[in-house]
Amino acid sequence: MSSSCSGLTRVLVAVATALVSSSSPCPQAWGPPGVQYGQPGRPVMLCCPGVSAGTPVSWFRDGDSRLLQGPDSGLGHRLVLAQVDSPDEGTYVCQTLDGVSGGMVTLKLGFPPARPEVSCQAVDYENFSCTWSPGQVSGLPTRYLTSYRKKTLPGAESQRESPSTGPWPCPQDPLEASRCVVHGAEFWSEYRINVTEVNPLGASTCLLDVRLQSILRPDPPQGLRVESVPGYPRRLHASWTYPASWRRQPHFLLKFRLQYRPAQHPAWSTVEPIGLEEVITDAVAGLPHAVRVSARDFLDAGTWSAWSPEAWGTPSTGPLQDEIPDWSQGHGQQLEAVVAQEDSPAPARPSLQPDPRPLDHRDPLEQVAVLASLGIFSCLGLAVGALALGLWLRLRRSGKDGPQKPGLLAPMIPVEKLPGIPNLQRTPENFS
């Protein structure tokens, strides 16, 4: 029975040796020296690091004197484990025939990489970044190779590998793991991102096609401030600035949306202001309000940004105090201050004093459209009037210069038939 078991063991070892030898020789160095890697449930080949290839050695587990594989196995300096599992992890020692230790090998088990999950985002119109995460936890040291290239139009095979289309390396961020950044991208172009995960047991690649206008997502607006408007217990004035990562250009602007709610109210009210400020006119008097803003490309490219941190403000509770200046004292100083303020080139700061005129929240574009429509209708009316006047003058001039044509403004009743008009018909009496 023991001989049959030993024979079966020899057969399994021979099969495992054939499988491992056909797949790969001794594994190349990866990570710390003296460490080799394997996958659970698969055969593993360990190589004695201190001897030349083909030298017969004996193998032991570290701290265990039992022989695992003798020098007469015919495997030389290699140790073949038919099917490894977690108990097989650890350190193995190899010795030559003279008893000298050849070296130590540490076996670690893990899994080959799966396809990584990749996503890309652009915070402005000329740079974008891509992040990734492993498809599965391999338990082994892992590296990532990242590159990108510009996609060509269908049929442009000659440009597929030209220097103008790449591929180029996607520089990985040294401060943030699993992230690479592409600078100087073209807003209307399409790019292919290549992220390859590599570990000692293999490699796996993910290819992702991206368009800058589709992945555009600005950073949240900055500097949000909420202030009360004196004398108006239901108004709040909110202002903010562009995110620092967005370069302001006339053809690449942002639009904004603003949300606000009173304290202890879960529902948000949303408005889309024009510009970098908004006056809330329906605030709840006496209650603090939370306000937040987000941004998006003004042509709706990409998606809305994340919300900015909330800012709080409470409407004014006191009545408006009209201060009457004392002109009997310091009249000259006040007049000089007013003149100096009018002559100053610095832009006037917005006043927080209430404006008695009603607020006009109409869109300036809407006002321009109305004015343009009125102008077009006025021009059309003038053109029609001028055409009618010219036609009337022409008909009048032609009637004076020659006889009227029958059928064209000619009288329907003969002149001699009209009452009170003498008969002008030629007779002998008329000539006598």
Curated annotation (Swiss-Prot):
Tissue: Widely expressed in all adult tissues and in embryos. Highest levels in kidney, skeletal muscle and embryo.
CC terms in the record's Gene Ontology section: extracellular region; membrane
Region (Disordered): 151-170, 309-332, 342-361
Positions bearing carbohydrate: 127, 194
BP GO terms, sorted: cell population proliferation; cytokine-mediated signaling pathway; decidualization; developmental process; head development; maternal process involved in female pregnancy; natural killer cell differentiation; placenta development
The Fibronectin type-III domain, residue ranges: 112-219, 220-317
Subunit organization: On IL11 binding, forms a multimer complex with IL6ST/gp130.
Purpose of the protein: Receptor for interleukin-11. The receptor systems for IL6, LIF, OSM, CNTF, IL11 and CT1 can utilize IL6ST for initiating signal transmission. The IL11/IL11RA/IL6ST complex may be involved in the control of proliferation and/or differentiation of skeletogenic progenitor or other mesenchymal cells. Essential for the normal development of craniofacial bones and teeth.
Name of protein: Interleukin-11 receptor subunit alpha-1
